[in-house]
Amino acid sequence: MFTFSHIAQSVGQRIRIEGFVRAVRIQSKMAFVVLYSGLHSVQAVCRGEAKEAVRPFSTHSYVALTAEVVASAQAPGGIELVVREAAEVELISKAALWPIAPESEIGAKLEWPVARFRERKETLTQIAQSQLEFQMIAFLQAQ
């Protein structure tokens, strides 16, 4: 699990980061991959061989990237990861396709309740609970 503050402290360094894919946008000369872990997300810019290596990524797949951390004004949060080689890209676990689409009728969603958690508004309660538990454990360990 990564936090944005840990990544921001690594500007100018190469790091390995693992996370879930929130979005992949492939353009003519580069690809953008947004990774998330809990509440934190970061954008990776993949060029050259790395651009082709991210093609199999799908939303919610678990991946690892080795990248240089760069300060970038146009990136979300002012930080982005730059990946240049295919060897720096690893698909750890490809996300399974869901039996229904996020825009399905409410009846289908009720038949597949776990699919609701693909939508951010549905996961906020679980994210808040996870963060609260994490902070409580950290507090108790410090005592």
Annotated model-derived regions:
Residues 1-143:
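Class II aminoacyl-tRNA synthetase catalytic cores and aaRS-like
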